[in-house]
């Protein structure tokens, strides 16, 4: 089952989520929207196993990264009833 990884604009560019991911799903890319000048990106979501270690590692109170497991992804997109 595939999962979706969403990075929100509350990301502070700290790299904690990237370092926490055991499968190298995440990477940092340039972004001018924060002081660090970079934001997390999830180019390899097909490799995500849904462990949510990235969520746990995120230091922001806004939880700047969310992993939506397969069922959650379908519901949030209105694909299941």
Swiss-Prot record:
Binding site for [4Fe-4S] cluster 1: 11, 14, 17, 58
Cell compartments where the protein resides: Cellular thylakoid membrane
PANTHER family: PHOTOSYSTEM I IRON-SULFUR CENTER (PTHR24960:SF79), PHOTOSYSTEM I IRON-SULFUR CENTER-RELATED (PTHR24960)
Chief location bin: membrane
Subunit description: The cyanobacterial PSI reaction center is composed of one copy each of PsaA,B,C,D,E,F,I,J,K,L,M and X, and forms trimeric complexes.
Name recorded for this polypeptide: Photosystem I iron-sulfur center
Top-level taxon of origin: Bacteria
Function: Apoprotein for the two 4Fe-4S centers FA and FB of photosystem I (PSI); essential for photochemical activity. FB is the terminal electron acceptor of PSI, donating electrons to ferredoxin. The C-terminus interacts with PsaA/B/D and helps assemble the protein into the PSI complex. Required for binding of PsaD and PsaE to PSI. PSI is a plastocyanin/cytochrome c6-ferredoxin oxidoreductase, converting photonic excitation into a charge separation, which transfers an electron from the donor P700 chlorophyll pair to the spectroscopically characterized acceptors A0, A1, FX, FA and FB in turn.
Annotated S-S bridges: none
Main enzyme class: oxidoreductase
Entry's Gene Ontology BP terms: photosynthetic electron transport in photosystem I
Record keyword Electron transport present: yes
Entry's EC annotation: 1.97.1.12
Gene Ontology CC terms, in alphabetical order: photosystem I; plasma membrane-derived thylakoid membrane
Residues that bind [4Fe-4S] cluster 2: 21, 48, 51, 54
GO molecular function, one term: 4 iron, 4 sulfur cluster binding
Catalytic activity, as annotated: reduced [plastocyanin] + hnu + oxidized [2Fe-2S]-[ferredoxin] = oxidized [plastocyanin] + reduced [2Fe-2S]-[ferredoxin]
Necessary cofactors: [4Fe-4S] cluster
Domain 4Fe-4S ferredoxin-type residue range list: 2-31, 37-68
Membrane-topology descriptor: Peripheral membrane protein
Keywords noted in UniProt: 4Fe-4S, Electron transport, Iron, Iron-sulfur, Membrane, Metal-binding, Oxidoreductase, Photosynthesis, Photosystem I, Repeat, Thylakoid, Transport
Cofactor: record remark: Binds 2 [4Fe-4S] clusters. Cluster 2 is most probably the spectroscopically characterized electron acceptor FA and cluster 1 is most probably FB.
């Amino acid at each position: 089952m595939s999962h979706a990884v969403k990075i929100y604009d509350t990301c502070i560019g700290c790299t904690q989520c990237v370092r926490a991911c055991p499968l190298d799903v995440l990477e940092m890319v340039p972004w001018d929207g924060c002081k660090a000048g970079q934001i997390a990106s999830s180019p390899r979501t097909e490799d995500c196993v849904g462990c949510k270690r990235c969520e746990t590692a995120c230091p922001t109170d806004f939880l700047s990264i969310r992993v939506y497991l397969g069922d959650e992804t379908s519901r949030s997109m209105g694909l299941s009833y």
